[in-house]
């Protein structure tokens, strides 16, 4: 597989975050290598904070992918309503979605932030490959 084919595969979330992508070091891997080298390829344990951060990232940079998030209309994750819908899955609460959308709106109302994110020269979520050694 040549470099161009590898980069094409790494643009697919399932490949980037799966076994194929784990052949390569990402920025997250480098951080883990420095702070927790024995667990560099161990998946992060799901948490509400990580889920909300991922939703914010997606909301700003990849809004077409928001449909992958399950949203539950419940006040907390401890309610019967939440557990009935979510089961064992960690889901966004409707109030968290509202908060993230408000934060997105605030960020995009700022001319500097909006231009840095949506400017004509912006290109994000683009994997790269370099040889370290």
Regions found by a protein language model. Give the residues of each.
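Metal-dependent nuclease catalytic cores that hydrolyze phosphodiester bonds in DNA/RNA
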Residues: 1-133
């Amino acid at each position: 597989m040549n470099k161009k084919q590898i980069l094409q595969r790494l643009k697919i979330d399932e490949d980037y975050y799966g076994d194929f992508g784990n052949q390569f070091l990402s920025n997250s891997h480098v951080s883990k290598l420095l702070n927790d080298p024995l667990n560099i390829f161990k998946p992060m344990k799901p948490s509400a904070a990580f889920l909300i951060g991922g939703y914010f990232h997606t909301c700003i940079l990849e809004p077409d992918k928001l449909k992958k998030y399950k949203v539950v209309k419940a006040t907390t994750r401890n309610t019967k309503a939440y557990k009935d819908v979510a089961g064992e899955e960690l889901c966004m609460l409707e109030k968290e979605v509202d908060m993230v959308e408000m934060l997105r709106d605030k960020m995009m109302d700022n001319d500097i932030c909006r231009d840095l994110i949506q400017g004509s020269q912006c290109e994000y979520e683009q994997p790269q490959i370099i040889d370290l050694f």
